[in-house]
């Protein structure tokens, strides 16, 4: 009864799940600006370059009656298609886990910000942006949807490498729209 009174059962079921493994595959878009990709996804154009990512995350803070968590995530990704290289990303950010419909469909939204290191200068980023670097800023936005009180959810993510307005490079970066699975444990 105490768990029920503290909020959604979907959120409460995740209270002790401080770790997650995510696996996703995405396709790189030729749309340069991430906000244009989000505003008009139906008209997005893509190149023949893809990425497959495995990630582990850890909750490092809980706030607002467990509705908001702070997470750190490490990723290993492989880029294939028109380019072939590895990518390592480390990001931290918030995840909101409580919505009015969470008892029907467990939902979360998240944002992560950190660094991305590619094993070589990504060819597709050079083609799209004119230049790039191995080390860029990395950020992501995602939405998860799954059954209430379940350890798994479908993951829809925008995976973004960026020069951060000249902070790490004059040009470079990419946007990938990805779909995968997130498992909490």
Write out the residue ranges for each language-model feature:
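Outer-membrane beta-barrel transmembrane domain signature
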Residues: 58-65, 70-173, 182-185
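Sec-dependent N-terminal signal peptides
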Residues: 1-2
């Amino acid at each position: 009864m105490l768990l029920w009174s503290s909020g959604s059962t979907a959120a409460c079921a995740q209270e002790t799940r401080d770790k997650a493994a995510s696996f996703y595959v995405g396709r790189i878009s030729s749309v340069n600006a991430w906000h244009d990709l989000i505003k008009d996804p139906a008209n997005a154009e893509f190149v023949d370059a893809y990425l497959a990512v495995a990630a582990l995350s850890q909750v490092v803070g809980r706030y607002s009656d467990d509705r908001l968590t702070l997470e750190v995530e490490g990723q290993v990704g492989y880029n294939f298609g028109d380019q072939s290289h590895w990518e390592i990303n480390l990001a931290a950010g918030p995840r909101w886990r409580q919505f009015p419909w969470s008892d029907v469909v467990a939902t979360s939204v998240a944002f992560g910000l950190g660094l991305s290191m590619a094993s070589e200068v990504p060819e597709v980023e050079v083609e799209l942006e004119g230049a790039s670097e191995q080390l860029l800023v990395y950020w992501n936005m995602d939405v998860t949807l799954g059954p209430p009180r379940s350890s798994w959810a479908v993951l829809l993510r925008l995976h973004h490498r960026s020069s951060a307005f000249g902070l790490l490079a004059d040009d470079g970066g990419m946007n990938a729209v990805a779909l995968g699975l997130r498992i909490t444990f």
